[in-house]
Each structure stands twice: as structure tokens, then as C-alpha cells.
Amino acid sequence: MLNIAVLVSGGGTNLQALLDSEARGENPSGKIRLVVASKPGVYALERAANAVVEGVVVRRKDYASSEDFDAALLKTLKEHNIDLVVLAGFLSVLGPSVIEAYPRRILNIHPALIPSFCGPGMYGLRPHEAALARGCKVTGATVHFVNEECDGGPILLQKAGDILPGDTPEVLQKRVMEQAEWKLLPKAVAMVCSGEIK
């Protein structure tokens, strides 16, 4: 059984999807043991507490350098014997030391169909705004392994959905979360935990 850490920065809707999937028995080869938040007071920590999962805060601004932040994060993960790291709306960039410690063991969910609307600065509503501004007819979500390139790791799963007339970035974001992200991320995590994806 793989010990999983979920890294978050906000409300934790993807975390909730993972917790719900686990509660339904959909990932018998993995267990969420730790939730790491990039700032205190985020609702994701409450979700963790409700599921009786330990939650901790590791803030980038508490450290003099990115390297010190990475070292603190890595220490936290190692202290909890974490095997798999899942970025679920985590807005801090992971440095090389963390990525090298977990080769093909860090997953990220991105709210667009990579290689479209990805890379530095493309998070939150921005990918949805960009898809609408470009006149795209479809969008979706991507789960990928994390490497040193922002949103550049190998793609594991993607799910597309239609962009409808009259969609706003907020409406599109909600639909992509409900129809793609909340389904894809638990599926990808279970596939990695079971060894189906290596």
C-alpha cells in the first residue's frame, strides 16, 4: 500500500474527490496519510480533519530560499513515509530536490488539455479564460507526472468536454472540475498505486 500526500493551496475540491474515492474503496492500493497546505486557514485543511487525515502547513514565505522550502517539504514528506505526492491545486513550485526524491511519483492535475493553456501562470481561472478567448470548442483536464518543466511531465490521463455558448470562465471552471478533474485525478492515483501506470 502506498502512502499518499496531497498538496493543496485552497479549498481542496480535488482533495475531496480523492477522499471520497478512497472512502468508496476505489483505491485499495493507496491511502491518503497527509495533507500539506501552502498556507494556514485553507478549507482543504478542514476537509483533511473531517476525514481524520493529518494536515500540516509548509509556507514558502517562512523560508529564506526556495531550497530551504524544498528541504522542509521533503523532510515533512519523509517523516510521514510518503510514497506518492499528489498536487491538487498546490500553487508553490516544487524544486529539483523534491522532484528527484520522487521520480514518477508526483502527480499534478491541470485544468486544460496539455499542451494547450499550460505552463507558468496558467492556474485557477486563467486556462479557462484563455480557452474562451481563443474560441476553443473543447477543453478539459490533464493528469501528468511532474518534472522540472512546469506542466511538462508525461501525460497520464486526459478528459475533454465541450465549451458551450455563453460559458463564462467561472461556469467553465466548474464544469471542468465536475466532469473531468474530480474523475480523472482519483483514477490516475489509483492506477499509479496499483502499478497499472509506472
Task: Annotate each PLM feature.
Residues M1-Y43:
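N-terminal Rossmann-like dinucleotide-binding module
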Residues M1-L2, E196-K198:
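SAM-dependent methyltransferases
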Residues P28-D68:
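Short, surface-exposed acidic-centric catalytic microdomains
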Residues L84, A88-I197:
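Donor/substrate-binding cores of folate-linked one-carbon enzymes
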Residues A64-I82:
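Glycine/small-residue-rich loop that forms an oxyanion/phosphate-binding "nest" at active or ligand-binding sites
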